[in-house]
Regions:
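Extended, subdomain-level signal for the structured scaffold at the beginning of enzyme domains
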Residues: 1-96, 106-111, 116, 127-139, ...
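Beta-strand-turn-beta hairpins that frame and shape the catalytic cleft
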Residues: 143-148
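Anionic-ligand binding patches
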Residues: 120
Length: 184
C-alpha cells in the first residue's frame, strides 16, 4: 500500500491540505497529516487542525509528500530543515513523489532548489513566478513533470487530489464519481 504525508504548518491552506487527505483516505490510501509545528496548528483561516504526527525521520519512508500552500504556511514548511532535506532526496528517487499546490511550488520547492528545469505551476502573482525562474512556469491547473506534481490553488484542490490518486496507481474515476464530481 502506498503512503502519503500531507504536511501542515501554522498558516497552511486548509482546503488544499484537507481535500487531499479526504480524497486519498476515501480510496484507502495510507495518508497521514504530518505537522512541522506541533500536533495542533492554526490554518490560514484560523481553523485548528490536529495532525496525526509531528515530523521526524520516518518522513523518509512515505511514497509521496504533499505540500499545501497558504501564507504563512508555505514559508513555515520551507523553514523545516528535515522537510527540505527529505524533498531533496525524494527529487532524485524515481519511486518517490513530491506534490505541491498554491504557494508551495514557489516557496518550498525553490527553497529545496529542486525546481530547476521542471514544468511547474503555482498560485498566480505575488512574485511566485519570479521564485520559479529556474523552472518553466505553466498555467495548467495541475502540472506533472517526472515525480513532481504541482497545482494552482484552492479551486484546483480536487483536481490535484484526483491526479495524486492516479499517480499512486489508484482509480480516481471511481472515487470522483462517488463524490459526484461528474455533476460539475
Amino acid at each position: 500500500m502506498k503512503s502519503v504525508a500531507v504536511m501542515i504548518a501554522d498558516g497552511s491552506e486548509e482546503i488544499e491540505a484537507l481535500t487531499v487527505v479526504d480524497v486519498l483516505r476515501r480510496a484507502n490510501v495510507k495518508c497521514d497529516i504530518v505537522s512541522v509545528d506541533g500536533r495542533s496548528i492554526k490554518s490560514s483561516h484560523n481553523i485548528e487542525i490536529l495532525s496525526d504526527k509531528v515530523i521526524d525521520n520516518s518522513i523518509k519512508e512515505y511514497d509521496m509528500i504533499v505540500l499545501p500552500g497558504g501564507i504563512p504556511g508555505a514559508y513555515n514548511l520551507a523553514e523545516n530543515k528535515l522537510l527540505i532535506e527529505t524533498l531533496k532526496e525524494f527529487s532524485v528517487e524515481k519511486d518517490k513523489y513530491i506534490a505541491a499546490i498554491c504557494a508551495s511550488p514557489a516557496i518550498v520547492l525553490s527553497k529545496a532548489n529542486i525546481e530547476e528545469g521542471k514544468n511547474i505551476t503555482s498560485y498566480p502573482g505575488k512574485g511566485f513566478e519570479e521564485l520559479l525562474k529556474k523552472a518553466t512556469y505553466t498555467e495548467n491547473l495541475v502540472e506533472v513533470d517526472g515525480n513532481i506534481i504541482t497545482s494552482r490553488g484552492p479551486a484546483t484542490a480536487m483536481l490535484f487530489a484526483y491526479k495524486l490518486l492516479d499517480i499512486l496507481g489508484y482509480n480516481s474515476k471511481e472515487i470522483s464519481n462517488e463524490m459526484l464530481w461528474n455533476l460539475l
